[in-house]
């Protein structure tokens, strides 16, 4: 009888191993601090005891912590539902928020809009759905260096998790245009968001991040 040699099993590709190692390093050095800073910054703008819709919530971890601090009733929506989430999550089509006009106290986007093809359209949807506030954490890109830095940050933080990366960054002027077109009044626009420890903050901080609280202006 002729023995058949077993074919060697293909192991993980070098690129996949590199991305996983990079993701673990990012999580260890940056993720915990990022969560803490974001929760503090966002909770300052969420109506106490209100209702919060978190768009692009992922596993809902940050939204859950914000709700715990503010007493808000929170629910998330996303284009896909993860097996385990920290909050209830509904699916949506990525374009129309599945809620009625002025049906929740606040709508939040946490590093979501730059992953979408048309941030302005989603901002208009948030203005329609939110009664009191639209809260946005995202990036500012004013020049080629900003764009390159944000691309690198996005790749390191998201590529290991298979996140789609359109690198759709906007300048402050573009964000303000989107807010105005949606009928949103800027109540706060904070660019001092200390997500990174020194010396990383000198490269990856420097005004590349913002947290904004916007108020829907009805009847204009």
List the model feature ranges, each with a label.
Residues 108:
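A conserved beta-strand element that flanks and buttresses the S-adenosyl-L-methionine
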Residues 116-125:
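A short, conserved alpha-helix within the catalytic core of class I
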Residues 41, 64, 139-199:
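C-terminal alpha-helical "lid/dimerization" subdomain adjacent to the S-adenosyl-L-methionine
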Residues 132-139:
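Conserved beta-strand signature within the Rossmann-like core of class I S-adenosyl-L-methionine
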Residues 59-96:
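Class I SAM-dependent methyltransferase SAM/SAH-binding core
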Residues 30-48:
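Conserved alpha-helix/loop element of class I SAM-dependent methyltransferases that forms part
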Residues 49-58:
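Conserved class I S-adenosyl-L-methionine
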Residues 15-36:
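Class I SAM-dependent methyltransferase Rossmann-like catalytic core
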């Amino acid at each position: 009888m002729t023995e058949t040699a077993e074919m060697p099993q293909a192991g993980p590709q070098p690129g996949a191993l590199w991305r996983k190692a990079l993701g673990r390093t990012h999580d260890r050095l940056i993720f915990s601090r990022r969560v803490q800073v974001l929760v503090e910054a966002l909770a300052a703008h969420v109506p106490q005891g209100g209702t919060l819709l978190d768009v692009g919530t992922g596993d809902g971890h940050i939204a859950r912590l914000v709700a715990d601090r503010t007493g808000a009733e929170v629910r998330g929506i996303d284009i896909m539902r993860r097996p385990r989430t920290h909050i209830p999550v509904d699916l949506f089509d990525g374009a129309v928020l599945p809620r009625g006009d002025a049906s929740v106290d606040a709508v939040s986007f946490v590093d979501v809009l730059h992953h979408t093809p048309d941030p302005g359209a989603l901002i208009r949807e948030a203005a329609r759905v939110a009664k009191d506030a639209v809260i946005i954490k995202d990036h500012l890109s004013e020049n080629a260096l900003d764009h390159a830095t944000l691309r690198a940050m996005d790749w390191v933080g998201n590529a290991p998790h298979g996140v789609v990366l359109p690198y759709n960054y906007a300048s402050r002027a573009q964000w303000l245009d989107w807010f105005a077109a949606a009928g949103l009044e800027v109540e706060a626009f904070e660019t001092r968001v200390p997500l990174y420890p020194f010396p990383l903050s000198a490269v990856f901080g420097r005004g590349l991040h913002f947290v904004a609280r916007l108020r829907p202006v009805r009847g204009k």
